[in-house]
Amino acid sequence: MRTVDPALLRPTVRTMPWRAVGAAGTLGLLLAAAPGLMGEGVDGRLALNVLRASAVAFALGAAFLLDDPARHTTAAVPTRRAVRHGLRLLCLAPVAAAWWTAALLLVPEAVRPPAADVTVEAATVLALALSGAALAVHRGDGARPGQAVAGFLLAPAVLGPLLAPGSWALFTTPDDTRWAAAHDRWAVLLCAAVAVGAVCAAEPVRRIGRGRLRSPSGTSGPSRA
């Protein structure tokens, strides 16, 4: 089984959009800390909405994960796109896990929503951001798709709770009888987002003329050498 050279991690870490992730993560933690600073007047609904807003904030920063000013240079290297994406995701995953744990712990336990269920929501929002970035890279030539992806993510995050049909029941509260069904839907969305991201991590094959395929490295057809 082929393994990834650990030497690839160092340049990946250097080119990660840590400023965007750090700024978004800081904003998310400030939001998560709000219920604890408000005293006894906080209820579970407010705490849940704050955690949802925190998850969206972090996802907006993660939308910049695949921004790479050198994309047009690295597209021709032997390392496949799936590996390059995977390395960036590998760098982000422990940061995201630690950040979300801190966000949950900042919310007072008395009003904290069920951790497992709200984590599914947060993971789905993050997966949507990452799959959106992967789709933008797969379908476009831009080196910095993060800003556009973040904009597309922010719009449904704000309008979704207001415009979503009641039958979808995504944005429910723990005391709602539809809470379990809602998180079944969140899980389906999560799986769909992961599937889209996996498909978009594949190298595109561009068709040139009739019946000729060109690979990202610039070769077409079998070698005549």
Where are these regions (language model features)?
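Helix-loop-helix units of permease transmembrane domains in multi-pass membrane transporters
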Residues: 64-91
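Secretory targeting signals
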Residues: 41-61, 87-150
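Central hydrophobic cores of alpha-helical transmembrane segments
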Residues: 27, 145-159
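Intrinsically disordered, low-complexity, compositionally biased regions/tails
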Residues: 114, 150, 154-155, 215, ...
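Juxtamembrane membrane-interface segments at transmembrane alpha-helix termini
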Residues: 60-69, 159-167
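Transmembrane helix-loop junctions in multi-pass membrane proteins
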Residues: 37-38, 67, 71-73, 103-108, ...
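Alpha-helical transmembrane segments of integral membrane proteins, especially early/N-terminal helices
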Residues: 10-24, 50-56, 81-85, 154-155
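Hydrophobic alpha-helical transmembrane segments
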Residues: 1-47, 134-139, 159-225
